[in-house]
């Protein structure tokens, strides 16, 4: 993974904005927050929103997230400088097929999907010559909330963006997209798409599946109301992300099927190991296993940085 330089913040008022016309498909947490971040830094001239929910688009316009609602998506992309796909992964192929014949000769297309190999395959299939101007990207930021009302301008501050360009991807398009996200607050790194999908199956997708599973387990007992009445901070912290969009995470699981299955198999092995220790009343082995996990977590990003992230997570949990 290669760092792509320091963050670039701001576009001074009065200068030509970085992006002239930005068309966003999907005005939710990610698409809406990007629009707000760019507007805050005067880095975009006009934002056009496209989406399935008229009510959500109207809310986005009322909140100042977008400047206009696209009447015809095909017409909207014709003179766009940049098109962002921030829709659930299951909609990506259909959107690419819809816009491909109408893209301008210099329009850059990018996405914000949590998986990359499937998105790249769809883009290669539908975009034709415009595939060279498609920049696969994944902002590593978010909350468990969704929709335009969930968007906020500082969502991306001090988080990562992963770009996974293909050999034929235009380097100028990569620079443009990378700069846009840097302005929004992200630090940009580059990975191979296959490496990205394996890594995020392990450190993100698996965690969401486990959170959904834990909530469903408790909800499945006859005394579920009483059980939920006794939950404390540990349960809430472990399951906060189970409040995320079911549609989005259904699509992520299916799109990253092979990598996620491998991650689940490894996790089941770890559970079997722990179960065996509990069954054998092997306290020494349990403590050693827990201590190893604690040490690994502390080392993960440095204790000070980890405490800051924990504090941010606790704050988000209180707001949820």
Regions found by a protein language model. Name each.
Residues 4-8, 12, 308-319:
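Short, low-complexity, charge-dense intrinsically disordered segments
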Residues 153-240:
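Internal alpha-helical scaffold of NAD(P)-dependent oxidoreductase catalytic cores
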């Amino acid at each position: 993974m290669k760092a792509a330089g320091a963050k670039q913040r701001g576009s001074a008022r009065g200068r030509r904005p970085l992006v002239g016309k930005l068309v966003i498909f999907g005005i939710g947490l990610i698409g809406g927050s990007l629009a707000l971040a760019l507007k805050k830094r005067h880095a975009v001239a006009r934002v056009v929103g496209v989406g399935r929910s008229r009510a959500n688009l109207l809310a986005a316009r009322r909140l100042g997230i977008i400047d206009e609602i696209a009447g015809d998506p095909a017409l909207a992309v014709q003179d766009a400088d940049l098109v962002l796909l921030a829709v659930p992964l299951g909609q990506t192929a259909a959107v690419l097929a819809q816009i491909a014949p109408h893209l301008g000769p210099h329009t850059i297309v990018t996405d914000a999907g949590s998986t990359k190999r499937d998105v790249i395959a769809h883009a290669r299939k539908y975009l034709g010559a415009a595939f060279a101007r498609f920049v696969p990207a994944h902002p590593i930021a978010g909350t468990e909330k969704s929709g335009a009302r969930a968007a906020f301008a500082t969502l991306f501050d001090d988080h990562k963006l992963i770009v996974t360009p293909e050999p034929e991807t235009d380097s100028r398009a990569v620079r443009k997209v990378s700069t846009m996200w840097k302005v929004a607050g992200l630090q940009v790194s580059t990975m191979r798409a296959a490496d990205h999908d394996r890594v995020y199956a392990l450190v993100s997708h698996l965690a969401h599946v486990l959170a959904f599973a834990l909530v469903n387990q408790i909800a499945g007992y006859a005394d579920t109301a009483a059980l939920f009445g006794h939950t404390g901070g540990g349960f809430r912290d472990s399951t906060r992300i189970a409040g995320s969009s079911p549609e989005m995470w259904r699509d992520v699981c299916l799109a990253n099927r092979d990598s996620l299955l491998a991650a689940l198999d490894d996790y089941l092995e770890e559970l079997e190991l722990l179960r065996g220790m509990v069954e054998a009343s092997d306290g020494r082995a349990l403590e050693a296993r827990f201590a190893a996990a604690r040490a690994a977590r502390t080392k993960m990003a440095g204790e000070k940085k980890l405490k800051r992230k924990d504090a941010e997570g606790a704050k988000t949990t209180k707001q949820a």
